[in-house]
Amino acid sequence: MRELSINNNSKLFALLLNIYNPKENFEITKNYFKSENPSDLIHSAQKTDCDILALRFNVLSLDELPKAVSLLRALLPYITKPLMICGTGKKEIDEKLLPELMKVLDREQCIISFATENTYKSILPSVIAGNHYVVLKTPIDINLAKELNILSVDMGLSLDKIIMNTDIGGLGYGYEYGYSMMEKVKLESPKDDYLSFPIISDASVESLKTKEARFDNFPDSWGELLKRAEMIELSSCAGAIAAGANIVVVNNPESIKFLRELV
């Protein structure tokens, strides 16, 4: 099992898989793996060049928690890459789901993604007890990011277990604001202990949600849809790297080889 070390100099790539409901993976993910079986996905992902394997448990309701926990327990023996556990992004689910998933983890130093100002009180106790990293996600605002970092440390979270997600849009102004926010944090971090943390970017996830990456009703000059989506992922990730992201989430393993040449 590989050790995970994350700091402000890290340049790591996390491969994201919607493992609970693989049908929700982006087309560029489906096209690469050509399977929607969780075991097959894990087996294939282990052979990729990703530094971190990010598994998203995209349950629809609290009734599905036992099934999600059972799935993680069944997959853990086959996972040797550093692991990131991702929730749904919905407060009422994640504050229950993530602690339950952490109970069955058979290793320390996993990344738990993510806690917000609305969920950190429910999620952090399990993070601390399991000696895991946690992604603290805030809207695009440096003061809110710093505040959540301080509140988390006050709860007992070690400084070296914090990873920041300062949020970003998928396209246009939202992407530009998110890019500028990462730059600002990196500029301020040398003189502020509560901003001096690694940053994770899921810009590719947001970019692949846009209509430009999902629909084929564009002029021929835009190119074939699948190739266009691949280029959108590469472009969004390249910008995040330039802005200073230490961990970049990708959905297509083939993106990693190209992106490594940028760091």
Name each model-derived stretch.
Residues M1-I6:
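An N-cap/entry alpha-helix motif that binds or orients negatively charged groups
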Residues N9-D40, L62-D63, G87-K91, I111-F114, ...:
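Active-site mouth loops of central-metabolism enzymes
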Residues N9-F13, D49-D51, I79-L83, D106-C110, ...:
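Short, well-ordered coil/turn segments that N-cap beta-strands
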Residues E24-T29, Q46-K81, I85-E92, F258-L259:
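Glycine-rich, proline-tolerant flexible connector loops at the mouths of alpha/beta enzymes
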Residues K34-Q46, D94-L98, M231-C237:
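Short, acidic/polar
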Residues I42-D49, L72-I79, P99-D106, K121-G130, ...:
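Acidic (Asp/Glu)-rich catalytic clusters
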Residues L53-N58, L62-E64, P82-I93, R107-Y120, ...:
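Catalytic beta/alpha-barrel core
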Residues N118-L262:
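Catalytic alpha/beta core domains of metabolic enzymes, predominantly
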